[in-house]
Amino acid sequence: MNKTFYITTPIYYVNDIPHIGHAYTTILADVLSRYQKQIGNDSFFLTGVDEHGQKVQEAAKKRGVNPLQHCDEMAKRFTSLWQELHISNDDFIRTTEQRHQKVVKKILNIVNDAGDIYADEYEGLYSISEERFITEKESESGQFRDIKKLKEKNYFFKMSKYQDQLIDHINNNPKFIQPEHRKNEILGFLKQPLNDLCISRPKSRLDWGIELPFDSNYV
């Protein structure tokens, strides 16, 4: 019986045109997928683009076009490049596609119904370049740009609830994260308190995203 093998690249941001880093990553994934098929396994290779967020919205504004038009043009650049490089991906996902948005909303409803999403007002340091809140330690590392203090209400996923389960799963499944030094790196990270994850942005600040199915004021 053939083994199944699934490989995905990151879904690339479309705030700018594709570059050699995108090509390098996708070629590596393509080689791995082709190898799996060559040895008789059923391989599925996914790549795509992340079309939502503040950076994309601002990039479209700078170009004087609406966000969807900007995304359409950038997505075409990516697919054209993969064709030129003879990349053999089985699918190409865009986060603006209805099939993607439908699944996102379904998962959000499942997690929310399970009681793992809550609303809270948060005040902290926000990195515009990374589009997320960061810690004081991260702000002092010099790795983050465009940092500002921000206070707003958002929705959070109770990631801290699953910290022990994550550690147990990684320890009980030695091949879950490879290579070994990356597994140890993640386990080292999980020894620290795991903060809950902010999963929303208010539409008053950012409206280019997938609307939360349980609160239309947020994406």
Set out the residue ranges of the language-model regions.
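Short beta-strand element of the conserved SAM-dependent methyltransferase core
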Residues: 125-127, 157
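Structured secondary-structure scaffolds
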Residues: 2-47, 99-103, 142, 147-219
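Short cysteine-rich clusters marking metal-coordination/redox-active sites
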Residues: 127-129, 139-144
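N-terminal Rossmann-like or analogous alpha/beta NTP/dinucleotide-binding catalytic cores
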Residues: 2-119
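Short secondary-structure capping/junction motifs at helix and strand boundaries
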Residues: 86-94, 112-125, 137-138, 149-150, ...
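Short clusters of hydrophobic/aromatic residues that line enzyme substrate/ligand-binding pockets
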Residues: 56, 60, 127, 176, ...
